[in-house]
A protein has these predicted regions:
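Conserved G1/Walker A P-loop phosphate-binding module
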Residues: 1-43
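Charged, alpha-helix-enriched surfaces in structured cytosolic catalytic cores
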Residues: 11, 15, 52, 105, ...
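Short, well-ordered alpha-helical microsegments
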Residues: 13, 76-80, 133
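Short amphipathic alpha-helical segments
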Residues: 18, 80-83, 106-108
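Switch II of P-loop NTPase G domains
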Residues: 40-86
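Conserved nucleotide-binding/hydrolysis micro-motifs of P-loop NTPases
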Residues: 47, 74-76, 99-103, 129-131
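Conserved beta-strand/loop subsegment of P-loop NTPase cores
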Residues: 64-71, 88-99, 112-127
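Canonical P-loop GTPase G-domain recognition
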Residues: 102-150
Length: 150
């Protein structure tokens, strides 16, 4: 399983990638290009912000089993183009991320942004400060991974 991680700044991509890669001793570092790891493909936020780079993100589905679109509650601007998720043939999961706390209006705005990008539902609201990252595995295993292997 290789997961495509896409999200704007402050969405927690690196923290989630570190968890999925199980890199306790040497954490992954932020870089300006696409990084392929054992379990994840990490897309820099600059690829999402630039319309000219969207085609490269779309092409990454060829090497991924599924994708996760992250949306932080703190983001004010629309990160994803309309119906962007509908271009992908692999399963795409929507996750709203936050640190410690959030306002209900900000949460609703983040969910609306994920739905506007073509996702049918928001799969998880995730606190990056708590030890809730295991819920990502449960969502992926729960929707199509019957063999229990991650």
């Amino acid at each position: 399983v290789r997961i495509l991680l896409v999200g704007p700044r402050e969405s927690g991509k690196l923290k989630i990638a570190n968890y999925l890669e199980k890199t306790n001793s040497q954490p992954l570092k932020k870089v300006a290009n696409i990084m392929y790891y054992r379990r994840t493909i990490l897309v820099p936020d600059s690829y999402l912000e630039s319309p000219w780079m969207h085609k490269h993100v779309i092409a990454l589905q060829q090497t991924a089993s599924c994708g996760i679109f992250l949306q932080p509650v703190t983001a004010k601007r629309h990160s994803y183009p309309p119906n962007f998720a509908k271009v992908f043939r692999i399963p795409i999961y929507g996750i709203v991320t936050y640190h410690k706390s959030y306002e209900e209006s900000a949460l609703q705005q983040a969910k609306a942004q994920l739905l506007a990008c073509g996702l049918e539902q928001v799969d998880l609201v995730l606190d990056l400060e708590k030890e809730e990252l295991h819920q990502i595995e449960q969502i992926i295993l729960g929707r199509g991974r019957e063999n229990g292997e991650f």
